[in-house]
Each structure stands twice: as C-alpha cells, then as structure tokens.
Amino acid sequence: MAPQHLPSTRMAPQGMLLGLLLASCLTFCLSCQNSNNFALTNPEKSTHEDSDTKETRREEELDAEVLEVLNPTQEWQALQPGQAVPAGSHVRMNLQTGVNEVKLQQEDKFQSNWKGFKRGRRLDINTNTYTSQDLKSALAKFKEGTEMENSKDELARQATVKQLFRPIEELKKEFDELNVVLETDMQIMVRLINKFNSSSSSLEEKVAALFDLEYYVHQMDNAQDLLSFGGLQVVINGLNSTEPLVKEYAAFVLGAAFSSNPKVQVEAIEGGALQKLLVILATEQPLPAKKKVLFALCSLLRHFPYAQQQFLKLGGLQVLRSLVQEKSAKVLAVRVVTLLYDLVTEKMFAEEEAELTQESSPEKLQQYRQVQLLPGLREQGWCEITAQLLALPEHDAREKVLQTLGALLATCRDRYRQDLELSRTLGSLQAEYQALASLELQEGEDDGYFRELLASIDSLVKELR
C-alpha cells in the first residue's frame, strides 16, 4: 500500500525553496519600479536639460501673457508664479515653506510707484530713464540741429543783406559808366581845399567847401592828412580873409581839427594860428565869427601847455577881458569863463597827478609849471570880472561862474572878501536857491539841480567868512 503522506524531513526543504523563489520575484519587481532612483549611472544632466527647457517654455508663455501686478503691503504676501511686482519692493524666499514672499520696503518712498498700477495691466517699465550714452547721443543731435538752424538763419540773413546792398565792384562799374569816381577821404579833402583856394571860386563855393571840410577833419587821421598835404596852412591863411564868412568857417574847420590832436596843434602854433585867432577876437567882427574863433582858440589851448604859454605872452588874457566887457558879446562871457576854469583845473590836475605818481619833472609837467596863469588872472583883474558875471540871469551861466570862483578862490580870496557887491549877490542867490531847492524836495528830488547850486553857494560863503 503506497504511503499517504511525505515525511516531514522532506517537506521542510521544499518550503524554503518556495519562499526564496517568492522573495526573488518580489525583489525583481521592486528593482524595476525604482530603477531611476537606484541606478548606478546618474541621468542628472538630461534631467536638468528637460527642466531648463520646461522653464524656458514657461517664461515664454508668461512673457506672451499679460503679467498680473501684485500690490505689496506692509505685510509679507505669497508671490504666485507669473505675478510681477513694482520696482523697489522687498522680495524674499520663506525657507520654511519654500514660497517667494513680497512686501513694501518704504511706503513713503515707493507708494507713488504703484498707486497707478491695477491688476490685469502689464508692468509699466519707466521709459523716462536714459543711460548716459542716450543723453550724449541726444545732446549731439540737439547741437547738430541747432547748428543747422543757425546756419539756415545765417544764410537767410545773408540773402536778405545781399538784396539790400550791391557788390562794390558792380557799383564801381556802374559809376565808371556814369563817369562817377569813388573818392577816398584824402582825395575829397584835396578837392575841397583846391576849391576853397581857387581864385575862380565864388564866396558861396568857398564857404560850402569849408563847411564840407569840417565834417571830415573831425576824424583825427583825416586832420593829420589835411596837415600832410598842406591843407591846414591854407585854412589858417583863410583867417586873414576880408570876408567874415570865410573867417567864421575857416575857424570852424580849425576848431574841429585842433580838438584832441596834438600833432595838428603843434603845426598850428608854428603856422601862426594863435596870433590870427587873437587878432579876430580883438577887432570888430560879427558875433557868429567871434563864436567860431573862440571855439578854435579853446580847442588849441586845451591840453597844450606850450600854446598856453604863448597865449599869455601874446596878451590873450587882455583880449578875453575886452571881449567879456563888450556889451554886444555878453553871450560869449560864459564861454570865456568856462575856458579859464578849464585851464586852471587842467594845470592843477596835472601837478597833482605828478605828485601822486612821483614822476621826476617830465617835459609836459615842466611846461605846465611855466604857465603863470593864476598870477596873470589876478593882475588882469579877473577876480572882479568873474564876481560880476555871477549876476547873469541864467542858471547855467551862474553854475559856470560859481565853478570858476571856486577855482580862483586861493588866488582871489582877499579880493572876494573886499567885494561888497559879491557878498550881496551871494546872499540874494542863497535865498533864491533855498526856495527852489525846497520846491525840489516837495517834488521828491533829493539831489536836484538847485540843491547842487545852493551847496556851491553855501560853500563859497563859508570860505569867505
């Protein structure tokens, strides 16, 4: 009879074998499931490449979409993927949760940046910000534009000027066709002198030539050119004419030529102009002629100490005294007084300047010291003459006389104190100008003309006490 059951010693090995088989199957299945985590070769590179590709695609998708702007507050807020924040916000990563968070950094500084932001709008990048290169480029373009505009304006201006004027060559050509010659100032003066000196010229033509010549000799160079070709001596000789008009306009030309022109002044003294001028003033002549001659004399004497010496030697002070005392020439009295004042102050300033600069006897200073003007004025009775002229009715004349009295005060003090008429005149003028100065003050003029005259009178009265 066959046995019904296997012995226990044989069943044990079979059970163990079956268990090992099941364990091997289970291990194989698990290894297949986790092969990526437990493989001997690490596919990290390919994994990163896949993730980078996904991130790039995600960023492109976010760029294509309208970014949602998160409005930060003073509290930390979670920042979701795809959300944008304004510039200046404070962003951090929460290490506990791994989430990006955002909040305001300084509310008072950045609040104005996001007040205008609204959800659903694209992030507004500040387009008003420029780099230094942008600014340099813009400035260069601006300068180029300005230069272009300036050049256009300049061209337009030149075109306008060209329309108003014509080329000199074109004018010369037309003048040649019309037999008209363009003359220089020198040529014009030569022509005028020839016309004046011609015996065939009428009186009117001679006077017209002198009148035109006076216009040109105002310029220093033209006056010296007049001297260079002998025209000055021709005009000086015109002072000997028997025609008062010729004397008048010859003196008119000489006065313009002498003015502030030392070279011409020297030649005039050597040419006998001073003697001729004094003769006209000392003789009976029309008043207009004497006015022009006195003008020429003043131009010759000013800033020319040698001429002043010759003036005193030739009896110039006596000639002027006689001129002032003429009843018909009272209008010239103020001009004579003004000339004397200028000569006195000119010498005074020259000596003071020499002392301040400590110059050792220059030639011009020596010439001024040889001019004995103040003693001559005292001897010739000018202390009394100037005091009498203070009675003139014109305010301007009184001003000039007061200036001269002040300049002569050191020389004529004793004479002024003895002059009772001068004291009465000063008292009368003092009362008159006090009233006029009061009217000026009422009108709001603190430094008016009459106050200045009153101050001069008060100062003179004080000096004579």
Swiss-Prot record:
Origin species, per record, is Rattus norvegicus
Report the leader peptide range. 1-31
- How does this polypeptide assemble, per the annotation? Interacts with HSPA5.
PTM comment text:
N-glycosylated. Ubiquitinated by the CRL2(FEM1A) and CRL2(FEM1C) complexes, which recognize the -Lys-Xaa-Xaa-Arg C-degron at the C-terminus, leading to its degradation.
Q: Which family does it belong to?
A: Belongs to the SIL1 family.
Q: Is Methyltransferase one of the keywords UniProt gives this record? A: no
InterPro entries the UniProt entry points to: ARM-like, ARM-type_fold, Hsp70_NEF-Inhibitors
**Would the keyword Ubl conjugation be found if you checked this record's keyword annotation?**
yes
Predominant location category: endoplasmic reticulum
Q: Which GO terms describe its molecular function?
A: adenyl-nucleotide exchange factor activity; identical protein binding
Spans annotated as Disordered: 39-60
Query: Glycosylated at which positions?
Result: 197, 240
A cellular component annotation (GO) from this entry: endoplasmic reticulum
Protein name according to UniProt: Nucleotide exchange factor SIL1
List keywords of the entry alphabetically: Endoplasmic reticulum, Glycoprotein, Protein transport, Signal, Translocation, Transport, Ubl conjugation
Q: Name one GO biological process term.
A: protein transport
Report residue spans for region: Interaction with HSPA5 and localization to the endoplasmic reticulum: 1-260
Q: Where is the composition biased (Basic and acidic residues)?
A: 45-60
- Role played: Required for protein translocation and folding in the endoplasmic reticulum (ER). Functions as a nucleotide exchange factor for the ER lumenal chaperone HSPA5.
Q: Where in the cell is it found?
A: Endoplasmic reticulum lumen
- The protein's superkingdom reads Eukaryota
